[in-house]
Design a protein with these regions (language model features):
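Surface-exposed, interaction-prone regions used to assemble/regulate multi-protein complexes
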Residues: 1-117
Length: 117
């Protein structure tokens, strides 16, 4: 699926201010999963064949270990998702940036799948 099609699919889920419930990485970063909940639906984004994964946040966000925070008290809500095509070593890949204030996520991968859980 091309970047523009994925972007349209994401926008159809009305992701703005959706609560992120899970971010997971497997196989040394080859696969990344982001799950968000909106309008009583869980939407899963799967990133496969990842060659770049970048997380950044504020120092204040990590003052208290997140494992000590109850899920209901986590406030990671999506502000923006942008999917674009990118070229890396002459290969066309997908680049996705997710603004989950105060966390920013950027993933460059071969495939992005989006579906309801």
């Amino acid at each position: 699926m091309k970047a523009q099609e994925i972007q349209q699919q994401l926008e159809s889920y009305n992701y703005m201010d959706a609560k992120v419930t899970k971010i997971d990485s497997k196989y040394f970063g080859d696969e990344v999963t982001v799950v968000f909940q909106n309008e009583n639906k869980e939407i899963e984004m799967q990133f496969l064949g990842c060659s770049k994964i970048s997380f950044s946040t504020t120092v204040e966000d990590r003052e208290k270990p997140l494992k000590l925070v109850e899920d209901k008290d986590l406030n990671y809500n999506i502000k923006k998702i942008e999917v674009t095509d990118c070229i890396q070593d002459k290969t066309i890949l997908l680049n996705c940036t997710v603004d989950v204030f105060p966390l920013n996520l950027e993933i460059c991968c071969n495939t992005i799948s989006v579906f309801k859980k």
